[in-house]
Design a protein with these regions (language model features):
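Selective transmembrane helix interface/packing segments
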Residues: 1-179
Length: 179
């Protein structure tokens, strides 16, 4: 039971930190202003890990390699700790890097789910909220192709629902492959 609690705590902390690092990569890719409250939150949460990595992996273009490497490092560390807790030292350690990549993909899909849900909530509850344009900007690149294919029904945009179903299907496939 104690191992299950430790497993849950490690998984939660790592997924929150890893998701914040991935969100930082995405914010940089979209060139969101560093003064944006979401960007300020991500930077405050992840600077302690990103800044030392930035010395080795400087920012080039739109891809924040230091944040991406930090997310991979967190996923790799999570895999090492989880395997040690579950199975001890008797492990196939060569599988750690592919497992960490699957964890990164898992976090990315859940991050997209969270962004879509928050964007939908903002659009329904308070579309004029200060953060609503930020979440619209974050979801627009993934929703735009679906919006071109799926017409609005009675004034309602169904593309977030379709994207949510697609993301859930991808998460189910990933669960079968990885875990």
């Amino acid at each position: 039971m104690l191992l299950d609690i430790l497993d849950m705590l490690l998984g939660t902390i790592a997924s929150l930190l890893g998701s914040a690092l991935l969100l930082r990569v995405y914010l940089g890719w979209l060139r969101v202003s560093r003064s944006n409250p979401v960007a300020v939150f991500c930077v405050a949460l992840t600077d302690w890990l990103v800044m030392p990595l930035r010395r080795v992996l400087p920012l080039r273009g739109r891809l924040d390699g230091a944040s991406l490497a930090g997310a991979f490092f967190v996923a790799l560390l999570l895999e090492v700790l989880m395997r040690l807790l579950r199975y001890g030292a008797n492990q196939a350690w060569f599988l750690l890097a592919p497992a960490a990549l699957l964890v990164l993909l898992h976090w990315t899909l859940y991050l997209l789910v969270a962004l879509v849900v928050v964007n939908v909530l903002f659009s329904l509850i308070n579309p004029h909220a200060p953060l609503a344009p930020t979440f619209d900007l974050l979801t627009r690149p993934v929703l735009a192709p679906l919006r071109r294919l799926i017409p609005a029904v009675g004034g309602f945009d169904l593309s977030p629902l379709v994207l949510f179903v697609i993301l859930q299907a991808l998460l189910q496939i990933l669960k079968q492959v990885a875990f």
